[in-house]
């Protein structure tokens, strides 16, 4: 009974706050090719994007996978595994003018923070950096549904810990080129 009451209270609170603020939330698919000192496969990710009217930022939280991911241990042994990670981005759009009718374009700047770990549990990665983003969006159903595509450039400062970083925090500067497509439902 207590769980049902808590769930009912949370639903009522969410409904009340949705009526006060316009919120856009929806799924996003990411494909992030990378330019790095060594050959690295692109990052694939599934994200949830969000925009709140009272905050001038577009947010996304993503689960990413890089597979296969290869590195060489300090003893020279090659290892092939996968990298799994979580990423948060926040972008400020400077413009979102109409091209024609439902079709708009946008550009802006933002930032990202990413944490990855190898599937074999031997490595941990921490990255952060700025990003520049541009894209197009379309609004349907009186602004209820937003479809968007975007492209970004995202240089990151990355620290590797564990076998891949010789256990001491090897520093790298990969440059990602994230491409995203997604939907936002506005309520």
Question: Across the structure, where does each feature detected by a protein language model lie?
Answer:
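Membrane-embedded beta-strand positions in outer-membrane beta-barrel channels/transporters
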Residues: 24, 45-49, 87-91, 131-133, ...
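Gram-negative (and chloroplast) outer-membrane scaffold detector with strong preference
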Residues: 54-147
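Cleavable N-terminal export/targeting peptides
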Residues: 1-24
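Outer-membrane beta-barrel "beta-signal"
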Residues: 173-187
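First exposed extracellular module after export/assembly in secreted or surface-exposed proteins
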Residues: 28, 144, 175-177
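Short glycine/proline- and aromatic-enriched beta-strand/turn motifs that initiate or cap beta-hairpins
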Residues: 18-79, 184
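Short, well-structured alpha-helical patches and their helix-loop capping segments
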Residues: 126-128, 171, 175
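Outer-membrane beta-barrel porins/channels
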Residues: 132, 145-147, 152-170, 180
């Amino acid at each position: 009974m207590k769980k049902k009451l808590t769930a009912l209270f949370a639903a009522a609170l969410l409904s009340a706050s949705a009526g006060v603020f316009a919120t856009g939330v929806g799924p996003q698919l990411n494909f992030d090719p990378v330019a790095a000192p060594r050959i690295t496969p692109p990052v694939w990710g599934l994200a949830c994007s969000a925009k709140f009217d009272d905050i001038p930022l577009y947010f996304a939280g993503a689960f990413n996978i890089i597979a296969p991911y290869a590195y060489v241990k300090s003893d020279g042994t090659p290892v092939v595994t996968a990298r799994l990670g979580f990423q948060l981005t926040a972008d400020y759009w400077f413009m979102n003018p109409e091209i024609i009718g439902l079709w708009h374009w946008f550009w802006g700047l933002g930032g990202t923070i990413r944490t990855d770990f190898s599937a074999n549990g031997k490595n941990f990665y921490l990255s952060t950096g700025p990003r520049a983003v541009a894209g197009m969006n379309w609004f349907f159903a009186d602004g209820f549904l937003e479809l968007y595509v975007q492209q970004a450039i995202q240089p990151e400062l990355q620290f590797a810990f564990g076998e891949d970083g010789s256990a001491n925090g090897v520093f790298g500067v990969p440059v990602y080129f994230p491409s995203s497509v997604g939907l936002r439902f506005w309520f």
